[in-house]
Amino acid sequence: MTSSRRRTTRKRGSWLLSAVAAVAAVGTPRPVIAQAADLTGAGATFPYPIYSKWFADYATVAGVKINYQSIGSGGGIRQLTEGTVDFAGSDAPMTDQEMARLKTPVLHVPTVLGAVVITYDLPEVTKPLKLTGEVVAEIFLGTIVKWNAPEIARLNPGLALPSKDILVVHRSDGSGTTYIFSDYLSTVSDSWRSGPGKGKELQWPVGLGGKGNEGVAGQVKQTPYSIGYVELAYARQNNLPFASIKNAAGTFVTPSIESVTAAAAGIELPPTTDFRVSIVNAPGKAAYPISSFTYLLVPKSMSSAKKQKALTDFLKWAIHAGEKEAPDLDYAPLPSYVVAILEKRLDSIARGAAP
């Protein structure tokens, strides 16, 4: 790793730690805006690094304290359904069945885009690996079990791959990151599609479980010869390498802000979209194939008009001022046409009837 890369990684890690510390330090809103309503949310760990920064910044800007529990997309949807939080975070769009269980209809509000990366710990290998979706699927199915297996070696000529067992690490909780990962594998691998399939929680054939993106990253970091999947920001924060993945155009693409943006450019959403879309395996030579929107799930009406306004105002701030902070934390900002759709959608949210 170059000294420039190390400085960049340290900067990102310090930025994230500062953001999390700032969230923890937020206390009672300043007296001049003490009437602002506080908000509670829970859900996805995938976007937590940028949400931490946003919530800290918005507390300073607007005096609104937002308490967000990074517990995984499945847990966030469950708490939203039970009515114990004001909003939820999820990388997986809600299914029709999940939405039918809600007391109040919700909007899917995309916030940023990110990449799920295939990260690993190979002490002998310093050059980034190249992998295909089919090979990744066979590794996580337990069919490919050695790092020097022919399927991996053919993709990485010249690399001295060790004859070591591959130790698979996956999520143990209900996870939007797992949803994105399994959505991609189901798209490119018949074996995966007919096996574990797509979902926030899976029956894993092999491997160790880690809770949250941070749990998987930590497990991979401390386990030689392991492989896992995490959001790009978590790999960078933990100084973990990640593979280039062969995309739909046949190009090996490194996950980055630019390649995630290219994946989003491969689709055009209509003004009537509900944003429940997949962009995995998107067309285009520059597109990273395991890319996704992440969402805040926002009730269309709330019992408290004050909270409704506070949440809507925060979202309007996030899709404008907040988007500018996305690249520093390894997320891609929303395309401008998506922001334009969201502006109209947020204006349409009904105000709560009670204060």
Where are these regions (language model features)?
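Bacterial N-terminal signal peptides
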Residues: S14-T28
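Flexible loop/hinge segments at secondary-structure junctions
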Residues: R30-P355
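A short, flexible low-complexity segment enriched in Lys/Arg and Gly/Pro that occurs
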Residues: K11-L16, V85
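N-terminal secretory signal peptides that target proteins for export/translocation
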Residues: M1-K11
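Compositionally biased regions
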Residues: S4-R5, W15, A19, G195
